[in-house]
Amino acid sequence: MDLLSPGTVQYAQNSDDEGYLSDEDAAAIYGTDTQVSSDDPLELLNRFVFAFNEALDVILIRPMAVTYRDLFPDPVKDSVRNFLRNLSTPVVLANDFLQGNPDRASDTAARFFINTAFGLGFFDPASELGHPYHDEDFGQTLGSYGVGEGAYLVLPILGPSSVRDTGGRVVDMFFDPLTYLLSGDEARTVSISRGALRGIDFRSRNIETFDEIAEDSVDPYARFRSLWRQNRQYQIENRDNQVEGIN
């Protein structure tokens, strides 16, 4: 199971929504579960990492997510998610500008100022004022300019990615003010802690959905790969129902 890949699971939850690719369209674009070699040259390595992630999820991550879900009330969990989203604003804003989207950049900036002023980011009054949340990263920016994803990758713990998006993670670090405000060790500690908390929060909201995808798929690896690719394309195109991801 790939914990830190929200787009995969949330896409599956919304796969019946209007606008998402049908199974036939997905097969035409990405191939069926058995047509994997041509678009997944690192499949053997990816499957090994996928199995590692599944084992880690069963042993550690899922139990932590269940505990987090059951221990804290929804308002607390919502505040945690809002705060983490607010921290990611500089990265989102930079990529809004790089993609040439001033309207989305305006929404992002407004969200940051409103939510920071009224609750230090723990609440989300900006959404009620017409500034909904959206997620952007440099991988999406590259994709918006036609850069292909390159080889599909499954990263340890982080889950589905690609050569393009993995490189994008590095660039996004330079957009994050914490990279410059904290020392090297402090920045790494904060980054890891923030990513882990965001992942646990996401996993806690999708426990049953994750279980159902794994149980109902003949080949969970191929299923997750297909879902991730479809959702990633929707994120790049800024379509409705796109899902934030920890990329």
What kind of region is each of these model predictions?
Residues 2-85, 89-99, 187, 191-247:
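N-terminal targeting leaders of membrane proteins
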Residues 81-163:
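Mid-length scaffold segments of soluble, non-membrane domains
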Residues 165-169:
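A short secondary-structure junction signal
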Residues 170-174, 178, 182-196:
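Extended amphipathic ligand-handling, pore-lining, and cofactor/metal-binding catalytic surfaces
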